[in-house]
Every structure is written in C-alpha cells, then in structure tokens.
Amino acid sequence: MTNMKSVEAYQQLDNQNLKKVVGGKYYGNGVHCTKSGCSVNWGEAASAGIHRLANGGNGFW
C-alpha cells in the first residue's frame, strides 16, 4: 500500500461535485455491482462466508 496518497493530497468534494461521481456499489462480502453488471471476488466471498459461519450467522458487515 505504498502507492496511496496522503490524506492531504485528496480534494474534498462539495455536494454539487459529488453528484457528478459515477461509481458502483460494494456489498462488503466480495460482491460489487456497476451499471454493466455485478462481479464477485471469490476469495473475499469465501472468507466472508467462513466468518459468517464462525459468528453463528452474523455477518461482519
């Protein structure tokens, strides 16, 4: 993670500019969706499933 910007390097968006941002939705369990469809990160999905089983059916998201 050495290629991340410092907090000071990011520009804060106001509400007007935030409305222009186009992005997808991340569900916290390895699934994320955009306009073109959904995809699964199977490693993360499996890990989320194991955590859910270990926590008695309570997810960590």
UniProtKB/Swiss-Prot annotation:
Gene3D superfamilies from the UniProt entry: 1.20.5.130
Keywords carried by this UniProt record: Antibiotic, Antimicrobial, Bacteriocin, Disulfide bond, Plasmid, Secreted, Signal
Cytoplasm among keywords: no
Subcellular location: Secreted
Signal peptide positions (record): 1-24
Biological process according to GO: defense response to bacterium; killing of cells of another organism
One Gene Ontology cellular component: extracellular region
Superkingdom: Bacteria
Family annotation (Pfam families): Bacteriocin_II (PF01721)
S-S bridge residues: 33-38
Family as reported in the entry's similarity comment: Belongs to the bacteriocin class IIA/YGNGV family.
Free-text function comment from the UniProt entry: Bacteriocin active against Listeria monocytogenes.
Entry protein name: Bacteriocin mesentericin Y105
Native source species: Leuconostoc mesenteroides
Organismal lineage: Bacteria, Bacillati, Bacillota, Bacilli, Lactobacillales
